[in-house]
Structure formats: C-alpha cells, structure tokens
Amino acid sequence: MATPDNHGPTVDGLDGAIAGRRISGSLRVDGFDVPLPPGDWLQLSSGHFKQPTAAGELLTLGRVKDRRLVGYIRITAGRSVANPPAGFPGTPGCDRQNQNTNILVNEGQEPFGHQACWVMDHYFLVPLQAWADRSNKLPALERAAAGDLAAKGVSYPQEMISLRLTRAETWGLLEVRYVFSPEEDHITSNNVATYADSDWQPGMIDRYPEKVAYIAKLKRWGDDFWPRFKSAFSAGRQTPSL
C-alpha cells in the first residue's frame, strides 16, 4: 500500500517532496503482493529483465530513520514466457551452506522446477559508496539505488544482515532480499576493507556474543515470515501483472 506524499517531517527525516511515496504492508510487483516488514519504505530503483524463457520486474526499497538507511529490500519477480513453462535456474547458495552463510533453510532445490529456500548472510555496502565510479562493477539496480540514496542525503552502515527468500516453480519466480541494520539494536561492526574480513563471517562471529544473538533473532524472524512469503508466491500464480 502506498501513502500520499507528505510534506512534513517524518521518522525518516526526509521531506515528502524528497522522499517520494512511502509504501507499507505489501507491494504489487509483477502480479505478486510482496510482503514487507513493518515501517514505511521508499522506492529507490526499478527495472525489468527479459530472457528467452522468462521476463519480470526488479525493484529496490529502503527504510530510513533520521537520514540513515536501516532497512533495504531487493525484489526479483518473474514469470515464464515459454510454452510449456521452462522454469528458472537453481538459486545460488541454496544447495549447500558455504563459508559466507550464517543460516540456510532449504525445503527444495530443483533447478528449473520446485525451489524453496532462504539464506542469511551479511550484506557489504562499502561498494555502494563508489556508485558514481563506472569502473566499480555494481549491478545497474544497485547503482541506481545508491545514487537515489545519495540524492536524498541518506547515509548507510558498512554492512547489514540479509535474508534472501526464494520461491520458484516452472511458471514463476519470487526472490526477495530483506536486509536489516544491526545499528537499530545498537550493534556496531569493526571497520574492514573487504566482505571476507567482516565480524559477521561465520568463522569470526563467535567472538561477538551480541552478533550471535542478533543472528538468532533474525533467524526467528525468518522462520515466522517464511510461510507468509510462500503464501504470497502461491497467490501470485493466477494474478499476473496487467
């Protein structure tokens, strides 16, 4: 649900003319009513993809508090355009837990068939700070989102924690990355140069009890949210975008 633009101060610290529309509850993307965590979300960037056997929409949203990014969502929603439906490639990271994965919940991983999994890891935002540098190989959607945040005067932490939820069948795909800032729980990270050096890496995190507890908290959130996400995917089968 989108709310009308507001020209007064809000929790995000942005004037409505700068923020644009604020979205809460859920958002229709390519016929799927994508569920959103609580709060007001701002659209940052959007796009489309088209492949020989599939097409769909891409979207990013941000949740801002006092001009600081505290939540981020990246949505990929697509449908098979082949007859018969050709399905979607296997989701990276869902087949096994690797050295970067904090949590893996895999209920099915059949490339080009039934896929149902979610993965938790950390999301390193430092490359976004160089969004204007074309030698920095950012995906176009992330580059546009970072540029929008810069235009709004919004800063963001070095890293956040990501839960990437995926459902796919031969007819469609819904993959959403829900990203949370530990700063909202007053948890900070040591400054590091690379993703692999992060405090949040599975090989490092046991040194930080507060970070272990935060991962456990988000695991509970993921377990609770997962059925809602799966229902949204199933409900979208008969409701393609117009």
Model feature map: region roles:
Residues 2-109:
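N-terminal Sec/ER secretory leader and immediately downstream segment
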Residues 68-242:
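Mature extracytoplasmic/lumenal regions of exported proteins
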